[in-house]
């Protein structure tokens, strides 16, 4: 059985993450019991009711990377103020001006990293920006359309369509500013100095961690399906073998499903004369057939002759 490919789909988000509906990872470690033998960092991905926040930030400026398709233009959009939430289930970008957001599946993330800012905007504590490239779908095409000349249909059919997000912190690590509202989610206790280059590093590490967790789950589900299919195939083969050939061919008889044990099966008694000189009787060598049940190990001990 071949599993059908499940293509990730970006979804619209109408509820903004807050301290009431998500829990920071540091708080999660304190409040949730630890399961023996299971890394605590992975437990949050298995609970459908638990949404864990691993990273993010409030003041990001979103734009798109230049590429050949848009002819060195930013796809016709201006910079947008967004808030980034890196959750155990998805990456959520919240558009402040729209009061809406989008949930990006980790399976659609192609690559991520930090890009060094060039030019006069680069200064101490404000030298890097976060880059996240994701596979396009219907919602992303509608929100971030591609302008300019399109490739041929034959090439587009087999090409991976992607959109490259640039998330630049508004403030430097060393800037002093005051929030309009009291911060209850991205606190210093949970995320440290979450500004400027430190915020980029924290977000990049959080995405890498969540990608690894979701990849492990995807691999585990594939292995479970493969094990089930393999077990079913082995059982079927064993059943067929048992029905068609209930006895193992030992090489001393040309007829299946029968046993003919003749001669002397005493080659473990330590008598070198029998080992060196094959004792033949009626043209048949010594033989012995054994059958093991339930895969139980059979152990024995060689006893010297008295």
Swiss-Prot record:
Going by the UniProt record, its keywords in alphabetical order are: Cytoplasm, Nucleus
Q: Which cysteines are joined by disulfide bonds?
A: none
Q: Which InterPro entries match?
A: ICln/Lot5/Saf5 (IPR039924)
Where in or outside the cell? Cytoplasm; Nucleus
- State the Pfam families in the record: Voldacs (PF03517)
Main localisation, per the record?
cytoplasm
This protein's GO cellular component annotations are: cytoplasm; nucleus
Please state which protein family the record places this protein in: Belongs to the LOT5 family.
Q: What is this protein called?
A: Protein LOT5
Lineage start: Eukaryota, Fungi, Dikarya, Ascomycota, Saccharomycotina
Q: What gene name is given for the protein in this entry?
A: LOT5
């Amino acid at each position: 059985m071949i599993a059908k490919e499940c293509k990730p789909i970006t979804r619209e988000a109408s509820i903004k993450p807050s301290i009431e509906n998500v829990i920071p990872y540091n708080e999660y470690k304190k409040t949730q019991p630890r399961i023996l033998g299971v890394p605590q960092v992975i437990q949050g991905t298995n609970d459908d009711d638990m949404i864990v926040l691993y990273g993010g930030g409030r003041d990001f400026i979103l734009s798109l990377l230049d590429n050949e398709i848009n002819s060195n233009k930013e796809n016709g959009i201006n910079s947008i103020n967004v808030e980034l939430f890196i959750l155990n289930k998805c990456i959520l970008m919240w558009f402040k001006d729209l009061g809406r957001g989008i949930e990006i599946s980790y399976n659609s993330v192609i690559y991520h990293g930090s890009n060094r800012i060039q030019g006069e905007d680069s200064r101490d504590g404000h030298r890097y920006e976060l880059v996240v490239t994701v596979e396009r779908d219907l919602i992303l095409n509608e929100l971030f359309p591609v302008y300019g000349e399109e490739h041929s249909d034959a090439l587009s059919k087999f090409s991976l369509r992607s959109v490259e997000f640039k998330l630049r912190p508004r403030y430097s690590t060393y800037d002093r500013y005051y929030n309009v509202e009291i911060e209850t989610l991205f606190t210093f206790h949970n995320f440290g100095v979450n500004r400027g280059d430190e915020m980029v590093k924290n977000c990049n590490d959080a995405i890498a961690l969540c990608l690894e967790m979701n990849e492990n789950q995807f691999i585990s589900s594939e292995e479970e399906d493969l094990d089930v299919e393999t077990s079913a195939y082995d059982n079927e083969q064993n059943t067929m073998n048992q029905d068609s050939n209930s006895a193992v061919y030992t090489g001393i008889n040309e007829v299946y499903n029968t046993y003919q044990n003749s001669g002397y099966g005493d080659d473990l008694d330590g008598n070198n004369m029998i080992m060196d000189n094959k004792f033949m009787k009626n043209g048949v060598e010594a033989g012995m057939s054994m059958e093991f049940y339930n895969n139980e190990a059979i152990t024995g001990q060689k006893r010297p002759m008295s």
